[in-house]
């Protein structure tokens, strides 16, 4: 019995990173599966339809039926494709979509170590440059999409890949400036420090960063190629976009990567602007609810906003999309970073 306890302790210790990473991957995959179910159900409700309702009670087993269908389908390779790049592109996209979750803190516990209060996050890795890590991962995702469009040997796929790359790069600039203003107000690039510092700051700082939160939400819609900025996948123009020649599991990897990115950017916005795992209002009995539950509820709220936007707002033209990014969001974000820094410096509220 003592040996079994020691084995379990070793399995759950920090050294058993493989177990932790596999648990995180399985959790993200299940979340993605039921995000698709949630999207279909919510849009069906808004359009006065039933949505998935046949496979299992209330259609709850529909994601597993869809997964089984994709696994058993034949993978068709176009004659003009470049085989190695064609198959490695979805793997790159899928892997990078999962890699960003390594630094996301789903909660935290506070301990007193050697007389110093220390907050330990519930994340796989707690690195000092967590914000930069996430932005590096999101920037690399462009390569998988470009490889998919180029290697497919299809003009539709190539045009969709070019659109996606230019769109993602354009809005990453605005997102970087938004996160810079958050980092200035928190005084750190560690995600757990950002949540803790933002929680202890006065409410007027949240109001000061509210315009940046709006810019960030619109930017993550464009960054994840979601409606109304889903120009790379515009069915009426490009059939399906950069993944038009993919089927079976390669297509599923692109699909899973897109929805995993949706959850990831929603988690990022929760950390930067919604207080992370803390309750929305500072009332004592709300702290009885675990921080992980608050974090998940806030992420679900943002995912509902993603779905709501898809069901209600028409698609932008490509020139409107680029004009919004370069002529509106970029100058506004740059000016507002200066405003936030100036106000905090003038009122002596910059973190020491």
Curated annotation (Swiss-Prot):
Q: Report if keyword Cell inner membrane is assigned.
A: yes
Disulfide bond entries: none
What Gene Ontology cellular component terms go with this record? plasma membrane
The UniProt entry lists membrane topology as:
Multi-pass membrane protein
Kindly give the PANTHER family that the UniProt entry links to this protein. NADH DEHYDROGENASE SUBUNIT 1, NADH-UBIQUINONE OXIDOREDUCTASE CHAIN 1
Q: Which residues cross the membrane?
A: 18-38, 84-104, 129-149, 177-197, 201-221, 254-274, 289-309, 328-348
The family note in this entry says:
Belongs to the complex I subunit 1 family.
- Which top class of enzyme applies to this chain? translocase
> Which HAMAP family does its entry note?
NDH1_NuoH (MF_01350)
Example GO molecular function: NADH dehydrogenase activity
Instruction: Enumerate the Gene Ontology biological process terms.
Output: aerobic respiration
What interactions and quaternary structure are annotated? NDH-1 is composed of 14 different subunits. Subunits NuoA, H, J, K, L, M, N constitute the membrane sector of the complex.
Q: What is this protein called?
A: NADH-quinone oxidoreductase subunit H
Q: Which reaction does it catalyse?
A: a quinone + NADH + 5 H(+)(in) = a quinol + NAD(+) + 4 H(+)(out)
Subcellular localization is given as: Cell inner membrane
Q: Which NCBIfam families match?
A: PRK06076.1-2, PRK06076.1-6
On the tree of life, the source organism's domain of life is Bacteria
Q: Which UniProt keywords apply?
A: Cell inner membrane, Cell membrane, Membrane, NAD, Quinone, Translocase, Transmembrane, Transmembrane helix, Ubiquinone
Q: What is its EC number?
A: 7.1.1.-
Primary role: NDH-1 shuttles electrons from NADH, via FMN and iron-sulfur (Fe-S) centers, to quinones in the respiratory chain. The immediate electron acceptor for the enzyme in this species is believed to be ubiquinone. Couples the redox reaction to proton translocation (for every two electrons transferred, four hydrogen ions are translocated across the cytoplasmic membrane), and thus conserves the redox energy in a proton gradient. This subunit may bind ubiquinone.
């Amino acid at each position: 019995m003592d040996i079994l306890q020691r084995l379990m302790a070793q399995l759950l210790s920090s050294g058993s990173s493989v177990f932790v990473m596999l648990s995180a991957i399985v959790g993200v995959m299940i979340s993605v599966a039921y995000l698709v179910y949630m999207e279909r159900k919510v849009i069906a409700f808004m359009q006065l339809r039933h949505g998935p309702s046949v496979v299992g009670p209330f259609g709850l087993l529909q994601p597993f039926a869809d997964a089984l269908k994709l696994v058993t389908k034949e993978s068709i390779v176009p004659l003009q494709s470049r085989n190695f790049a064609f198959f490695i592109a979805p793997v790159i996209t899928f892997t990078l979509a999962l890699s960003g979750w390594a630094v996301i803190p789903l909660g935290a516990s506070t301990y007193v170590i050697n007389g110093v209060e220390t907050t330990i996050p519930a994340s796989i890795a707690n690195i000092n440059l967590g914000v930069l890590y996430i932005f590096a991962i999101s920037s690399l995702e462009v390569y998988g999409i470009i490889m998919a469009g180029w290697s497919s040997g299809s003009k539709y796929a190539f045009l969709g890949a070019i659109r996606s790359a230019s769109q993602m790069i354009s809005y990453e600039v605005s997102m970087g400036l938004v996160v810079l203003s958050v980092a200035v107000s928190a005084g750190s690039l560690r995600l757990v420090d950002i949540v803790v510092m933002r929680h202890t700051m006065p409410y007027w700082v949240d109001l000061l960063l509210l315009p940046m939160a709006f810019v960030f939400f619109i930017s993550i819609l464009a960054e994840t190629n979601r409606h109304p900025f889903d120009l790379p996948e515009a069915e009426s123009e490009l059939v399906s976009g950069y993944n038009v020649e993919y089927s079976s599991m390669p297509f599923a990897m692109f699909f899973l990567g897109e929805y995993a990115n949706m959850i990831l950017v929603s988690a990022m916005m929760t950390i930067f602007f919604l207080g992370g795992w803390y309750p929305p209002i500072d009332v004592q009995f709300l702290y009885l609810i675990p921080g992980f539950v608050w974090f998940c509820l806030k992420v679900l709220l943002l995912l509902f906003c993603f779905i709501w936007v898809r069901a209600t707002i028409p698609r932008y033209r490509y020139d409107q999309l680029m004009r919004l990014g370069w002529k509106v969001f970029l100058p506004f974000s740059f000016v507002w970073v200066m405003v936030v820094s100036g106000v905090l410096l003038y009122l002596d509220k910059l973190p020491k």
